From Swiss-Prot:
A lipid is attached at C20 (S-diacylglycerol cysteine). It is a lipid-anchor. A lipid is attached at C20 (N-palmitoyl cysteine). This is 17 kDa major membrane protein. One of its GO terms (cellular component) is cell outer membrane. Residues 1-19 form the signal peptide. It comes from the Bacteria. PROSITE patterns: PROKAR_LIPOPROTEIN (PS51257). Its main location: membrane. It comes from Francisella tularensis subsp. holarctica (strain LVS). InterPro entries: FN3_dom. It is found in: Cell outer membrane. Keywords: Cell outer membrane, Lipoprotein, Membrane, Palmitate, Signal.
Length: 149
């Protein structure tokens, strides 16, 4: 019985001390300032994590045979999600050919290499002129290359 009473008193003492420390009773001003600094640091870290830098890319175009163009794209995603970077093909002006755009599949975070082709003959129409491939992130062109066909 005495052991139970002693354990109960010890438990109450520990609970009382713990409540004082969480309520800020009896603590020093340094401890309060430290808690504020910790909260500010956590907020700053959260804001930095939310502010992801935009990806970087390089694109180069080569002619393949009579009617294809190949775009080789190197991308550093900088922690941006899959589908955030797009490849946009611009057909020559006045050629009556279609522009296309699609997301680039992310295989690696840095130095991700991918490629895509476009056919310069659409139906009976041969789309001669200046073809441009743009790498786009958040409606901003981050890399571009052109070739004359």
């Amino acid at each position: 019985m005495k052991k139970i009473i002693k354990l109960s008193l010890l438990s109450l003492s520990i609970a009382g001390l713990a409540s004082c420390s969480t309520l800020g009773l009896g603590g020093s001003d340094d401890a309060k300032a430290s808690a504020k600094d910790t909260a500010a640091a956590q907020t700053a870290t959260t804001e930095q994590a939310a502010a992801v830098s935009k990806p970087t890319a390089k694109v180069s175009l080569n002619k393949l045979g009579q009617d294809k163009i190949k775009a080789t794209v190197y991308t550093a995603y900088n922690n941006n999600p899959q589908g955030s970077v797009r490849l946009q093909w611009q057909a020559p002006e006045g050629s009556k050919c279609h522009d296309t755009s699609f997301p680039i599949t992310k295989y690696a975070e840095k130095n991700d290499k991918t490629w895509a082709t476009v056919t310069v003959k659409q139906g009976n129409n041969f789309c001669s002129g200046k073809w441009t491939a743009n790498v786009v992130y958040d409606k901003e062109v981050i890399a571009s290359d052109s070739i004359n066909i």
